[in-house]
Each structure stands twice: as structure tokens, then as C-alpha cells.
Amino acid sequence: MKKTYKINEIFYSLQGEGYNAGRPAVFVRFSGCNRRCPFCDTRHESGVEMTAEQIRQAVEKADSGQNTMVVLTGGEPTLQLSDEENLFPYTSSRRFIAIETNGTGAVPSWIDWVTVSPKEDVPLDKLPKFNEVKLLFDETRLDYIQLFNRDGIIAFIQPIDRSGKMNIQETVNFIKQNPRFRLSVQIHKLIGIQ
């Protein structure tokens, strides 16, 4: 019996945040998460069981075979992924594979770009190797956020919505005082795309 993955949705859009913002991508949203973050905007419990081949076919269909970047997101994709099965094996038309993870699981070696959005209880030395970190700006997490304020780390700070009010000015002020950080806004939400 072939391994299946619980997939919430697969869609073609633009990456809306971080280092690859604005880049066309097919998003593969995995169901399930080991966190229950109050600010999460993802319905990560529902989904359809799919084999690796079905996922590859859906990705090809989503971008009409244009070979764009693939973003594995969730939920928490590392709960279902491993080195044992490469969802996108090397071929002549190899895609660039990115993952968005909370940093609590092992990232498969076949991933090209790792964006980690750690939660406060994940120590820096316990996170998987990553290319960029995305931190939600919360004044109660300043000590944790400052752990990423060092050379060699691409760190994005993102304002959060609390009771319908974004903390944009506080986020901007923090970045101006800590210039190693970069601002990340959810472009896809600003321009009204998925």
C-alpha cells in the first residue's frame, strides 16, 4: 500500500512573505499541526489523502507545467514528510522546493529552502537548519526574537493582528532599532490573492 499524505489544498499563487515574496509558486498545504496558535489563519484539520504521485500531478496541473517553485506549508508539513520519500525527485525539470515549518520537526534533505517560524518554546539550537526565519512581532517575545539578531541569519519580523488592530508601527520601530531584521508583510492578503 502506497504512503499517503493528508493535503488541505494545492493552489497556484505568489509567495506572499519573506525572502521569496512575489515569486510565483504552487502551494501544497498539509493538514495537521502540533501547535494551536491563537493567531493562525489556517484550517489545518480537513484534507484529502493523496499519494506522492497524485501530489506531483496536482502541482503540474496547478501551474500548467511551468515548473515554478513549490512551497510545502501547513499546518505543519514535517509531521508527514521524511527523507524516505522525496515528493519531487530529481529530474531534468527539477522544481525549487521550499518548506514553511514551525521548527519542531526534522526537515527532509531534499528541501531546497527552509523558512522556519519558531514558537517561543523551541530553543534556537534545537531548530532545524534554515535559510530564513519568520518571527511574529509580539512585545511579550522580545527576548526570544533577539536570539535571531545576529550576523548570518536572514530574519523577518511580521506584524500581527490583535483584535482587528495590527501592531505595524511597533514592528517598524523595532526593526529601525534592530537593523539586522527585515519587515515582512503578507503581500497576498494586501492585494487580495490566495
Residue ranges and their predicted role:
Residues 67, 78-194:
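Conserved AdoMet/S-adenosylmethionine-binding subsite of the radical SAM
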Residues 3-10, 14-17, 32, 55, ...:
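Residue-level signal for well-ordered alpha-helical segments
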Residues 1-27, 31, 35-39, 182, ...:
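Flexible, acidic/Gly-rich N-terminal and inter-domain linker regions that tether
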Residues 1, 24, 46, 134-136, ...:
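Short N-terminal micro-motifs specific to bacterial/archaeal maturation
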Residues 27-30, 48, 117:
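Solvent-exposed, non-transmembrane amphipathic alpha-helical segments
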Residues 29, 73-74, 186:
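A secondary-structure boundary/capping signal
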Residues 5-9, 24-25, 36-111:
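Conserved Radical SAM active-site core
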